[in-house]
Amino acid sequence: MARSTTATAQTGGLSLETVEDLFRRLEQLNEIGAALSQEKDTGHLLEKILVAAKAITRADGGTLYVLESSDEGPRLRFAIMRTDSLGIAMGGTTGSDIPYYPIHLSGKDGKPNNQMVAAYAALTDKTVNIADAYSEEGFDFSGTRNFDKKTGYRSKAFLTVPMKNHMSEIIGVLQLINSKDPATGEFGPFSHSDQRLAESLASQAAIALTNRQLIDQLERLFKSFIALINTAIDEKSHYTSGHCKRVPELTMMLAEAVNETSDGPLRNFNMSDKDRYELEIAGLLHDCGKVTTPVHVVDKATKLQTIFDRINLLDTRFEVLKRDLEIAALEQKIDLVSQPSLEKVDARDRLGQIEQKLRESLRRLESDREFLRHCNVGREFMPPETQERVKQIGTGYQWTDISGGTADFLTQDEIKNLTISKGTLTHEERETINHHIVATIKMLEALPWPKHLENVPEYAGGHHERMDGKGYPKHLTREQMSVQARVMGIADIFEALTAKDRPYKRGKTLTESLNILGHMKLDGHVDPDLFDIFVRKKVYLRYAEQFLDPDQIDEIDESKIPGFAADPA
């Protein structure tokens, strides 16, 4: 079986190339190489490779195959197809899918698929230059002939070039069809110069494609490491398991809305794809410092919770008090009935008094017990009189422990926790929680960020700052913060307000959340211009439709939102 692995016709059907033409095409090749190295999108890069190869060899048509793995073994996937004279353009930026099955490099019997010219080039790492497919006996061109029969085309000359990466591994195949004579417009074979130019281009293209694939793989690996960190954080706390995913989503929604703004103070804010990627990475890493936060603080669902809920200790103490009261009452009754001189009527009255006092004491105990259980649940606000009652209960009862010693019913630490005015965290615990942003900044600033990601620490580290400088940890003002950091601040707050997985509160409705956020604008907490865009562009609604429960999405009267400026300033 004949194998055409070099040019079978170097000049047949084509005029001899002039030296000037060859130099022109070499210059074109150099320009193409430079252009390919600058392309950032893999799909666009594949398209540029084929279009450039067609131009430099004057091919009417061509296909670019990409080698990929499958359950049946390696195969060549149709990535880009072009045939100028038929107006065919599929794959790439066309949005038109290529309706052809991939070419497997081996058959079902495991033998090499040397019948298909593209597979043969990939398997042998050899260029195949065929002058006339209709007279070629070495390969199976039945599919090509069927295509020609349907379209009236004649696929005559084929130039098939393997593409190798820096490790000499085949990554794809470039196939060109029908070289067009610039003088006559007729189709003919590819010359030896065409082949050398195509091979040179394929080599440059393979390097550019490999670089792009390596960059894409590294970016995917980098994101996977970030996802790994976020998974660890989510596993620590099922109460905030979605926070690390939702904040980046809302951050990008608001950033895009600002990017689309053509008037107002933020009209000059523009994001490139690089800027978007940088902000996305910052959003994904904004809480990475939470890996250092103790889980019993992160998950503190009640005020008395440490590694367990200490309310059960209080229940035990109440049972001890109840037992002591009942024992004391029984002892009084026994002492009473043991007095022989006591008249029956008087004894009955005194026994009734003992029983009545016991019932009243037990009712008071049960009332105080339920009261403390109620206080143990974190709420929006605990009034001073409620806090005072906790303190009275704490020191008003004395209980006897197993060693026989007596102590106040509540320890000072328990009183401190039960009188937390808002939520479930003490000041010290809140400082521990807040320390996660310090840890985040330290962790991110320790990394050797490339130039296109150098702002990640600033973006991620500023979402707890306030516009008036009263935030933490650096007490930055609005003027000291980037727009991106301020965007993330709003996203972080709104997500927390609407989150339905917090242990001490329900997820708020849109109206409630926007009212709180509006007051935060007036109070100098969040950026006023970003807040107005957040409402005006209905970013809150897009987020709600994706992440909130239906009962949280109520009707919004934007005119009643505190501080909202309906029209751009």
Model-flagged regions — what are they?
Residues 189-193, 229, 299-324, 414-444, ...:
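Divalent-cation-assisted or electrostatically stabilized phosphate/pyrophosphate-binding catalytic cores
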